[in-house]
């Protein structure tokens, strides 16, 4: 195992990379489609119909490229989450296992965003063009995106984000406190095993609620929706535990206010 002087910078570097990737993901999924950052190619009149698009190489080739990028991300994210790979990584990297997983996921997502090919000439599933929809639909989408991202950040705070990012494992190791998961209750461990993506609904809102749902955006939203759906396995016991934890967090947050009122 590497000394603490190497473990801490490695975990911090992974966290910074993940944070920067998250900021870039907000730009990629929200700011670009909402603020018109997608390059145009002749406007709506130049777009192909659905049947014509199936024979247009200028549409099929970038879609195939985008599909490959998404499959690369999904493959990395799923493969490194398997027990076999996690055991191998824990054996050779120790407490940096989670940080390495987070860093690799961030790099895979960076590849998707950096090399993503828009398809401006492809057909669209829907598009707000005529007034008043051209004004109000983007505004409504913007509001829903802001709410969704605020909820995502709030949920990450309710969950143990330091452990999700791999920081807590290194912190506990340096202080000799053991494995953080070993201190959690069986109900919490059961929840974490079922809920790999605690912000599923909010991410789906960000992916689908856009003024113009073009071909490449449809591919992105559809594939990630399928992936999130397959990875989401909550049951009633998990929901009861989540509700109890949320009430506990709210009670703790309200205690200082109660003290001031007294």
Swiss-Prot record:
<feature type="topological domain" description="Perinuclear space">
    <location>
        <begin position="29"/>
        <end position="58"/>
    </location>
</feature>
<feature type="topological domain" description="Perinuclear space">
    <location>
        <begin position="211"/>
        <end position="216"/>
    </location>
</feature>
<protein>
    <recommendedName>
        <fullName>Nurim</fullName>
    </recommendedName>
</protein>
<feature type="transmembrane region" description="Helical">
    <location>
        <begin position="98"/>
        <end position="114"/>
    </location>
</feature>
<feature type="topological domain" description="Nuclear">
    <location>
        <begin position="81"/>
        <end position="97"/>
    </location>
</feature>
<feature type="topological domain" description="Nuclear">
    <location>
        <begin position="165"/>
        <end position="191"/>
    </location>
</feature>
<dbReference type="GO" id="GO:0005637">
    <property type="term" value="C:nuclear inner membrane"/>
</dbReference>
<keyword id="KW-0472">Membrane</keyword>
<keyword id="KW-1133">Transmembrane helix</keyword>
<feature type="transmembrane region" description="Helical">
    <location>
        <begin position="192"/>
        <end position="210"/>
    </location>
</feature>
<feature type="transmembrane region" description="Helical">
    <location>
        <begin position="134"/>
        <end position="164"/>
    </location>
</feature>
<feature type="transmembrane region" description="Helical">
    <location>
        <begin position="217"/>
        <end position="234"/>
    </location>
</feature>
<feature type="transmembrane region" description="Helical">
    <location>
        <begin position="59"/>
        <end position="80"/>
    </location>
</feature>
<feature type="topological domain" description="Nuclear">
    <location>
        <begin position="1"/>
        <end position="4"/>
    </location>
</feature>
<feature type="transmembrane region" description="Helical">
    <location>
        <begin position="5"/>
        <end position="28"/>
    </location>
</feature>
<comment type="similarity">
    <text>Belongs to the nurim family.</text>
</comment>
<dbReference type="GO" id="GO:0005635">
    <property type="term" value="C:nuclear envelope"/>
</dbReference>
<dbReference type="InterPro" id="IPR033580">
    <property type="entry name" value="Nurim-like"/>
</dbReference>
<feature type="topological domain" description="Perinuclear space">
    <location>
        <begin position="115"/>
        <end position="133"/>
    </location>
</feature>
<keyword id="KW-0539">Nucleus</keyword>
<feature type="topological domain" description="Nuclear">
    <location>
        <begin position="235"/>
        <end position="262"/>
    </location>
</feature>
<keyword id="KW-0812">Transmembrane</keyword>
